[in-house]
From Swiss-Prot:
Biological processes annotated in GO: translation
The protein's name: Large ribosomal subunit protein uL11
Summary of the function given for this chain in its UniProt record: Forms part of the ribosomal stalk which helps the ribosome interact with GTP-bound translation factors.
Pfam families registered for this protein in UniProt: Ribosomal_L11, Ribosomal_L11_N
Designated gene of the protein: rplK
GO cellular component terms, semicolon-separated: cytosolic large ribosomal subunit
Disulfide bonds: none
Length: 141
């Protein structure tokens, strides 16, 4: 018999540095799963991506078991790193805080493609370009 899915919990945590403290503890504790087992598994899986925020999707089952699936870092995070900035513009349409090239845009789109609702790389590029525009990052050829 298949296990019954109870909940899907989505968290954004620093890679390799998850702890049982909030937000992890309260989010997972209410479903009765072993928090330390999750923290250990997450830190092992995300150790290679140190320094970035790595979203995780945790499927919790009725027998208190779980499956953690790592997603790609948020587009805004990848864009900030590519542009070499700390944060986006406070007034995006009026001010430009950084620039990225088309090649960098394509690389970010390729990295994000598995987690995006896009059919091809061009559609993914347009989505990432929109995120860049809303952050005040200009795309140059």
């Amino acid at each position: 018999m298949a296990k019954k899915l109870v909940a899907v919990v989505k968290l954004q945590l620093p890679a390799g540095k998850a702890t049982p403290a909030p937000p992890v503890g309260p989010a997972l504790g209410q479903y009765g799963i072993n928090i330390m087992a999750f923290v250990k598994e997450y830190n092992e899986k995300s150790a290679s991506q140190a320094g970035s925020i790595v979203p995780v999707e945790i499927s919790v089952y009725s027998d208190r078991s779980f499956v953690a699936r790592l997603l790609t870092p948020p587009a805004a995070d990848l864009l900030r790193k590519a542009a070499g900035i700390q944060k986006g513009a406070s007034t995006p349409k009026r001010t430009t805080v950084g620039t990225i090239t088309r090649a960098q845009l394509r690389q970010i789109a390729q990295q994000k493609l598995p987690d995006m609702n896009a059919n091809d790389i061009e559609a993914a590029e347009r989505i990432i370009a929109g995120t860049a525009r809303s952050m005040g990052i200009k795309i140059v050829e």
